[in-house]
Amino acid sequence: MSRAPDTHSDFIPRHIGPSDEDQATMLAAIGAASLDALIDEVVPPRIRSRAPLALPAARSETDVLQDLKRMAARNQIYRNYIGQGYYGTHTPNVVLRNVLENPAWYTAYTPYQPEISQGRLEALLNYQTMVADLTGLDISNASLLDEGTAAAEAMTLARRGSRSSSPVFFVSQHCHPQTLEVVRTRAEGLGIELVIGDESRGLPECFGVLLQYPHSLGGVADYRELAQAAHAQGAVVACVTDLLALALIEPPGQWGADIAVGSAQRFGVPFGFGGPHAGFMACRDAYKRNMPGRLVGVSKDAQGNPALRLALQTREQHIRREKATSNICTAQVLLAVMAGLYAVWHGPRGVRRIAERVQSLTGALRAALAGLGVKVANDTWFDTLLLETGVATPAILAAADCARTNLRQVDGARLAVSLDETVTLADLQALVNVFAAGLGKDEVALPAPQASLDGIPAAVRRQGPILSHPVFSSVQSETDMLRYLRKLADKDLALDRTMIPLGSCTMKLNATAEMIPITWPEFALIHPFAPASQTPGYRELIDGLSAQLCEITGYDGISLQPNSGAQGEYAGLLAIRAYHQANGQPQRNVCLIPASAHGTNPASAQLAGMDVVVVASDANGNVDLADLRARIAQVGERLAALMITYPSTHGVFEEAVTEICDAVHEAGGQVYLDGANMNAMVGVAQPGKFGSDVSHLNLHKTFCIPHGGGGPGVGPVAVRAHLAPYLPGVLDAQGRLDPEAKVGPVSAAPYGSAGILPIPYVYIALMGAEGLRRATEVAILNANYIAARLRDHYPVLYAGRNGRVAHECILDVRPLKETSGISAEDIAKRLMDYGFHAPTMSFPVAGTLMVEPTESEGLAELERFIEAMIAIRAEIAQIESGERDRDDNVLRNAPHTAQMLLAEEWHHDYPRQQAAYPVASLRENKYWPPVARVDNAYGDRNLVCACLPVEAYA
């Protein structure tokens, strides 16, 4: 494959970093004759694919985008009044251009390294403050995957926090139907008894209650007495709520709710055919240590200045594994940032004004429809009306279709309409005319909207201000907003500045051509429950991408519904569980998991109702075959599955993978192959053809969806034919599950985060079969080049046959702790002074660094990283020799801020120049960490998860 592009539109050499000449140099340096020879040395021959993938050849950016435009044009943009948790919204253009379309925001990683993540941590703290303020609760997390999964997480949080011994969780029938189905799926896996009913008739004995506030079909109830009754029996009260409605109605925390969940979608994030959108959760302080998802907290840095960080991480799956509060890993950070900035942009008066306008227009519509003789079933409302349309229902729906308008069909005799901030008076008059036409009546004029809150009972009207923190009143103009966004972005390190060599994270190029289609109206403005006749373009995209991914993986079926890798794991394990049950083997509920597995693996197994048994690793980091066989014998007929990551989390292709799969199959189990490391296999090995039964993929890793600072992601689950009937169920246009479905949905929308599926589709089309294979080969080359160049300075902990690694390598820095007192964390923080994000720390082996360069980093950037790591080793050598102090040195004090280096006095055992400019190239291009090393322990001891007063930064 020639490096030099034949035309300016040749994409492959723009995605792959090293030129052909650079690749030759690197191959010579590691002693490999060619890329093909290197792959032969790395990938076991028993699994190596020789035939090219049956995919079209690479195409130009122009061709691919034109084809996608054709596809998008097949979607029909209707005026939507469906509601049901998804609403029209205006994305502020300043946020669209400077956040959603800005690689400084969308290419960042999860802020586990807080010193280089202060900008997005501040934006997330705004979001948490907004959610806690509007819900009236003590603490909010930094986003969940969507509203339905947030409700399921509320159920599990209620079970952990309840004083009741009852196995029952009560769910109001007034919840959105898709929420009911996602909660039902979760309850079945955990053995929770779900009771769905009308809460006005009283509560059964239960450990928790889930309410909808306002109701799915429009009512606004006073739940104060119900909450008291639930608390009296030891139950936890959760409610699904609407952030915009909470500008006008009483916060759930004030009437007794313990947990509030929902979606922040209508705060500036378009439909996207169902996602991605940020789910939210807020709760009382008593539940904070059991709360799922990431949590931004305020701490201080080494200089005593306020600094932000991810708090209470010991709750999370990467630490607690099967004992974690949730399997949540990737969430929806980019969308949470947008929602929080929507509140900053509009401010408290603006948000309340939008809410008042929506409520006022709903009242005007109610009056107009009453004038047509339509019976409105709900006497209270915020934005939704339930209409008893009887035998006229089909005619009204036909009239709506003629007017390119979508209504929510509740059943054969009832419709519902929901309004939002995008609705104009002209839209509303057109809607009234639709009903007049359907009823065969003369058109009536829409009455003038009245500025009143008549639809909201006086007892539940919000009293007092909203969004009272000064940050929400800080922006007076677009100039202010632009500068605020630039200030935040400048605090962070993302791929637009530097390589992010995080092992197991695949921080590769997110090309502009891949990103462009996600904001096209034909993709962005489609409601997830729009009729199928309006979404043929989306269905062509979904079917095409599904077929491509099946070809790449060698599987027979796939679901794109899971909206994170962890959800894909969960869906795959549910499929295995349902398969065993269908075969009359419900006792198969044990999942074998290697000790080195990703933390999501055991957490997902637990959510799927499985018991986890750990399998040991051998001295080379591989699955210990003898221990595997012993564990299989130990669990016997209870064996459900083995979860294995491949290539392994130790960065090698295990030679015995087919033997491992055979052993599990012979014992009646299924093999789940975690696809987190698929970037090392595309085009060279197909897991569905070498023994695995099911895998999830991380489209936000291998297939170029950006990480967004911690989401969005898409985690499709791919299966062999025998598991295909057990893929997640797809909801219909009313949000209801097909009664023939064998497994329920795992996401609220039928196709999950469909709005970002154009990204992997474009990537695959631009690369073609040959380009995808070459990307894998170069990813492996880059990792082996780094390993070879650094091996004399840091031991490479694991290697496969021929001394090769896969697409990542583990640098063993543990001996340095003994000789110098320097830890992996010290090296990670010192890399910030060199302008780098740290590699993955202490996973899968404590005290090590795991490096994954991906194929997108060129030789010059690899050399810059290598230079930094060698220079840091020399700094450690100065400590080892006694030339530098063991406690006061450039590593222990890293990172160094400009404030530290400009201090009037300097008392350290090394010069300022070494701290700031350890290599000459930094004088030309220097990133300054905005805070010094963050005190993690202080932040957890003094937990604050909302914006600090302005005075704290003085």
Swiss-Prot record:
<comment type="function">
    <text>The glycine cleavage system catalyzes the degradation of glycine. The P protein binds the alpha-amino group of glycine through its pyridoxal phosphate cofactor; CO(2) is released and the remaining methylamine moiety is then transferred to the lipoamide cofactor of the H protein.</text>
</comment>
<dbReference type="GO" id="GO:0005829">
    <property type="term" value="C:cytosol"/>
</dbReference>
<dbReference type="InterPro" id="IPR015424">
    <property type="entry name" value="PyrdxlP-dep_Trfase"/>
</dbReference>
<dbReference type="InterPro" id="IPR020581">
    <property type="entry name" value="GDC_P"/>
</dbReference>
<dbReference type="InterPro" id="IPR003437">
    <property type="entry name" value="GcvP"/>
</dbReference>
<dbReference type="InterPro" id="IPR049316">
    <property type="entry name" value="GDC-P_C"/>
</dbReference>
<feature type="modified residue" description="N6-(pyridoxal phosphate)lysine">
    <location>
        <position position="701"/>
    </location>
</feature>
<keyword id="KW-0560">Oxidoreductase</keyword>
<dbReference type="InterPro" id="IPR015421">
    <property type="entry name" value="PyrdxlP-dep_Trfase_major"/>
</dbReference>
<dbReference type="GO" id="GO:0016594">
    <property type="term" value="F:glycine binding"/>
</dbReference>
<dbReference type="GO" id="GO:0005960">
    <property type="term" value="C:glycine cleavage complex"/>
</dbReference>
<dbReference type="GO" id="GO:0004375">
    <property type="term" value="F:glycine dehydrogenase (decarboxylating) activity"/>
</dbReference>
<dbReference type="InterPro" id="IPR049315">
    <property type="entry name" value="GDC-P_N"/>
</dbReference>
<dbReference type="Pfam" id="PF02347">
    <property type="entry name" value="GDC-P"/>
</dbReference>
<comment type="subunit">
    <text>The glycine cleavage system is composed of four proteins: P, T, L and H.</text>
</comment>
<dbReference type="Pfam" id="PF21478">
    <property type="entry name" value="GcvP2_C"/>
</dbReference>
<keyword id="KW-0663">Pyridoxal phosphate</keyword>
<protein>
    <recommendedName>
        <fullName>Glycine dehydrogenase (decarboxylating)</fullName>
        <ecNumber>1.4.4.2</ecNumber>
    </recommendedName>
</protein>
<dbReference type="GO" id="GO:0019464">
    <property type="term" value="P:glycine decarboxylation via glycine cleavage system"/>
</dbReference>
<dbReference type="InterPro" id="IPR015422">
    <property type="entry name" value="PyrdxlP-dep_Trfase_small"/>
</dbReference>
<dbReference type="GO" id="GO:0030170">
    <property type="term" value="F:pyridoxal phosphate binding"/>
</dbReference>
<comment type="similarity">
    <text>Belongs to the GcvP family.</text>
</comment>
